[in-house]
C-alpha cells in the first residue's frame, strides 16, 4: 500500500497553506506520505512539498489539468488509486476539495468523512472528528475501506518542519478531453489588499463589542496597518457587519496566525475553537470576566473605541 496521499490545493503555482498543514498532519500517521499535484508546470513545486513531509510527490501535468475540472481530475485520480493503492486520500475542505472528494467517493463507491477537525488513519480505517450541532458537540466518524477518503478543515492542523525525501513520481496521464464536461472561461479574483483569512500571519477580528459598522471600521483600520486579515465572531457576522466568509470559529474558519487580535469578542467556546491555536493572542474587552482573557497572552480591559484609535495613531507614526 502507498501510504497517505494529500491532494495539493494550488492555483498558478500558489500553494494554499492547508496543503502544508495536511502533509504535516499525515506525517504523524507513521506511514509514507505523498503529495499529489495536477496542473501545468507544477513539477517545480515538488521541493516545497518535501519540506513539509512528502516522501513522494506524484506529479501529473497536462493541458487538461490547467484548471480544476471535476471529470478530468476524478478520472486521473481513479486510475492512480487503482495503480498505486494508497491507504488514504485526503483533501482540503474547500470549494474544489469538497467537489473532488465527493465525486471521487461516488465513483469508487466508498464512504467519505467531511470537514474534519482531527483525523487518524491506519490501514483500512480512518477516524475523523467533526463538529456537530452548530459546534456544540463533537462526533467521531469512522470510515472504512481502501482508500479512506476525507476532507480536512483548513487551519486545524499545525504546519510542521519534518521533511520528506520528495521523490518525484510521474504517473501516466489517464484523463482525456472526453472527461472534461465543464469549461472554466475565466477567473475573477476578489479584489482585496488583505490576505486570505486562513492564510494570514496576522488576524484582527471584531465581535459584538464593535456595536456596529463604525466599530468594524476601526478593526479594519488596525488590520490594514498590520497587513492583517479581518475576521469576526458569530455575533458580528449574524448582525451583518461582516460577511459569512470572515467568520472565525468552529462553524466558520479555523485560523492559527502568529498574532490574533480579538476586539470586542467575549470568547464563546465556539469562537475559541477557531483561534485558540494562534501563536500569540491579544484581546481587548471591557468585561474582566470575558473567557477570551483565559486564552490570551496579552489582554487590555478597556473600550476598543478608545484603544484601537490610539493603536492606529501610534502605528502611523
Curated annotation (Swiss-Prot):
SUPFAM superfamilies associated with the record: Adenine nucleotide alpha hydrolases-like, DHS-like NAD/FAD-binding domain
Pathway membership, UniProt: Lipid metabolism; butanoate metabolism
The keyword Iron belongs to this UniProt entry's keyword annotation: no
GO MF, one example: flavin adenine dinucleotide binding
Cofactor, free-text remark: Binds 1 FAD per subunit.
InterPro entries: DHS-like_NAD/FAD-binding_dom (IPR029035), ETF_a/b_N (IPR014730), ETF_a/FixB (IPR001308), ETF_alpha_N (IPR033947), ETF_asu_C (IPR014731), ETF_asu_C_CS (IPR018206), Rossmann-like_a/b/a_fold (IPR014729)
Pfam families assigned to the protein according to its UniProt record, in alphabetical order: ETF, ETF_alpha
A GO CC annotation given for this chain: cytoplasm
An annotated GO BP: butyrate metabolic process
This protein's UniProt keywords: Cytoplasm, Electron transport, FAD, Fatty acid metabolism, Flavoprotein, Lipid metabolism, Transport
Inducing or repressing factors: Highly expressed during syntrophic growth with butyrate (at protein level). Seems to be constitutively expressed.
Key word Ion transport present: no
Protein purpose: Part of an electron transfer flavoprotein involved in syntrophic growth of S.wolfei with butyrate. Probably receives electrons from butyryl-CoA dehydrogenases, and transfers them to the membrane-bound quinone oxidoreductase Swol_0698.
Protein family per UniProt: Belongs to the ETF alpha-subunit/FixB family.
Subunit structure: Heterodimer of an alpha and a beta subunit.
Name of the molecule in the record: Electron transfer flavoprotein subunit alpha
Originating species: Syntrophomonas wolfei subsp. wolfei (strain DSM 2245B / Goettingen)
GN (gene name): etfA
